[in-house]
Structure formats: C-alpha cells, structure tokens
C-alpha cells in the first residue's frame, strides 16, 4: 500500500501544472467576482463573500473529481497498470485506496488554499468550528463528484470522456449556483437547478456557514445521487469486464 501511495505521489508531482490550474482558476474567479459583485444591502454583501468562497472551493474540488480522478484511472487501464495490479498479490482495494488518497490530498489542498485566500485576502471571518465543519461538509459532498468521475471512466474514448467531463464541469457549476445565485435565473431554470446534486451540495455548505442550519434533506439527496451514480458505474464496469 505504501508503495502504491508513493507511486501516486510521483504521478501527482509530474502533473503539477494541472494541479495548480484546478486550484488557481477557482481562486481567480473568487477574487474577481468577490471584488466586482456589489450589493446595496451591506448584510447581503457580507454574506456573499464567504458563500462564494465556499462554492468556489467546491468548484475546485469538482475539477479534481471530474478530470484528475477519471483520467488517472483511464490511463492505468490504457497502459495495463490496472491489469498488472489485478494479477499481482496486491489486493485491488489497495489500488483504489491509493487513488482516493491522491484525490483526497487534492481536495484538502483546494480547501486549504481557497480558505486561506478567503480569510487572508478577502477578510472572511468564521469561527473555528464553522471553518472546520464547512471543510468537512465539502469533503462529504465531494463524494457525488467522485461517483460521477467513476461513471466517466466507463467511457472508452479518452477524447469523448474529456468532452463530457468539461460539459458536466461547467453545467454542474452554473446550475448548482457556484458562479452566481440560482435566484437570478428564470423560474423554470431554477426548478431544474434544484434537481442538481451540485445545487444541494452548495446549499448544504453555504446554509450551514451563513445560518448555522444543517440541511439534512440536501445531504440525503447528495448521498442518494452518489449511490445511484456509483451503482451505475459498477454495473457498467462489470459488463465491460465480461465482454
């Protein structure tokens, strides 16, 4: 297991550019929009910046789940590394755990860097408990994006997988309210947005940070989506292995 984690660490160091871009782009968006979007209501303005910080953190994490995670699995499938592991004495669960450790490191980096920018540059103020629980909620809700990433791996063409991943990346962000409040959309669009897992992931985190309320319904919806996506991915993977 230790050797597998070391391999993932080396691979991560070789893709440092992608790593920095996945965090840097949301940070830039956060700095630009938090400085340009102005509300007449002082209370709304004060609530907007920490809320936007949290949604941009989730946006960054979704990038790792939709691009880095499926890409590294697809590459291992292509270069027969997965086949080698399957025929080695190593349990296959250790292979997947090493992948999750790598993605978790990316997630934690996103949280640490975006939170640091929010606190040090934009003056976001939250209690220690609010910072910690917000980070934990972001990690929990990221499960649904990882499940979508597993679905993307089932696409055999790397080019098609990249196109679908990019489409999902921006659709989930926009329809989930990561870039702008869903309330600004027409009513019929809002109804669609409220069906999105990204919407409920954002609602769960931002509502806790703003009001201290825990939206159990949103948590259950996010976990429900994750279970459904994971189930479909496992079924498709099993069918692919049987062919």
PLM regions: where:
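Transmembrane helix-loop junction
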Residues: 34-35, 75, 84, 119, ...
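Alpha-helical transmembrane segments of multi-pass membrane transporters/translocases
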Residues: 22, 33-34, 203-243
């Amino acid at each position: 297991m230790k050797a597998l984690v070391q391999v993932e660490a080396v691979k991560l160091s070789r893709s440092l550019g992608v790593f920095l871009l996945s965090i840097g782009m949301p940070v830039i968006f956060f700095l630009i929009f938090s400085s340009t979007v102005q509300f007449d209501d002082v209370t709304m303005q004060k609530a907007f910046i920490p809320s936007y910080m949290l949604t941009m953190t989730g946006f960054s994490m979704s990038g790792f789940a939709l691009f880095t995670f499926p890409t590294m699995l697809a590459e291992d499938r292509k270069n027969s590394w997965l086949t080698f592991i399957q025929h080695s004495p190593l349990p296959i669960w250790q292979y997947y755990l090493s992948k999750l450790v790598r993605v978790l490191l990316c997630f934690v980096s996103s949280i640490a860097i975006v939170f640091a920018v929010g606190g040090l540059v934009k003056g976001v103020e939250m209690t220690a408990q609010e910072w910690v629980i917000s980070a934990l909620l972001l990690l929990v809700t990221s499960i649904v994006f990882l499940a979508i990433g597993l679905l993307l791996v089932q696409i055999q063409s790397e080019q098609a997988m990249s196109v679908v991943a990019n489409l999902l990346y921006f659709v989930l962000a926009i329809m989930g309210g990561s870039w702008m409040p869903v309330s600004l959309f027409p009513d019929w669009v809002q109804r669609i947005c409220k069906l999105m897992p990204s919407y409920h992931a954002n609602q769960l985190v931002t509502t806790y940070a703003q009001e201290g309320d825990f939206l159990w319904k949103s948590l259950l919806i996010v976990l429900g989506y994750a279970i459904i996506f994971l189930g479909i991915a496992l079924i498709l993977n099993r069918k692919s292995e049987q062919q």
